[in-house]
Every structure is written in C-alpha cells, then in structure tokens.
Amino acid sequence: FCFQGEKNDSHDFVYDAMKGGASALVVEKKIDIDFPQVISSSSRKMMSEIAEIFYDFPSREITTVGVTGTNGKTTTVNILSAIAEAAGQKPKTIGTLTGQLTTPEAPDLQRQIRDSVGSGASFLAMEVSSHALLQHRISGMAYDAAIFTNLSLDHLDYHGDMESYYKAKSLLFSPSHAKLAVINA
C-alpha cells in the first residue's frame, strides 16, 4: 500500500516492496513500472477495508466502544474495561497503554481485534485518535458506541486549526461508524 505520509511517500519504495515479495501494489498515482497496480484515491482507506475483510470483520463479533477526545481517552477506556469486567464480560483495551500508537494502523488493529475475539474477549474499549480518523485506520469499523471526552488546544501542528481538529474528531460519530454517541457536556 503506497501513500503520502507526513514525511515520506511510500510510492518511492515500490522496488523494496517488489523485492520483498509483493504481488501487486495499491497506489494513489500510477507508477511507470511493469508491475500490477491498483490505483485508489485513498490507499489508506483501501488498506483499512481490505484488513477488515482479511480478518473477517472482527469488530462485528464483539461489543466495541471507541473513545475520542483531546484528553481522557486512556482513563475512559480503562474505566469502561473495569465496568465490563465487573459485569462479567471479558474486556480488551487498545490504546496508548497497549501499543506504540493510540490507534494502530488498520492491519494491526484488525489483527488485534481478531485475536481478542479468538481468545474469548466479549468487550472492546479502544482509543481513537484524530490522526487515525483522518488516516482511515478505522474505516469500516462497527462501533456499538462512540464517546467524546473533550476538545482542547492540541495537535494543531497536524490539524492547522480547531475547526479542522473538531471535524476530524467528529468523523467517529457518523452513522457508518457508531450506533450510539455519548458526548461529554
């Protein structure tokens, strides 16, 4: 999967992918090489959707809650996990305490959810960063509920302004992502 990152463009590394055994490339712009390519307007979104299909839509097999906001995601996820456990559920959490990224890249995320379902987890609470929302890491995810903790001045180096930051966070609350929304007033 080739896409433009913040610092690098993975289209520049297609020969490494080919040497590594890739049988095709998903690209956002045609590359002048004799190699199978699928051109997508968003390779990241396609990667997320393919990961969901590859892992057989694991978020549909577990009660899933996504938590977003500037602050309080980790605390909220841990409280939800404790409540689920007290209610007799087997919880799993995904976030800053369990990984390097607040929200893992789509293939890693889908694998973690599939592994959780396979090990008997019945409840998933996960942190969902604004970066992950804009980078389509959760495209196709089925959340039973989405929680918004707050929005304050942060990550403006990435988003540019508060309106863009707000719009990124609000993506989690679209009907295609969440059945229920909980907004901290």
Model-derived regions, located:
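N-terminal leader/targeting and accessory segments in enzymes
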Residues: F1-E49
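Phosphate-binding loop of NTP-binding sites
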Residues: M47-A185
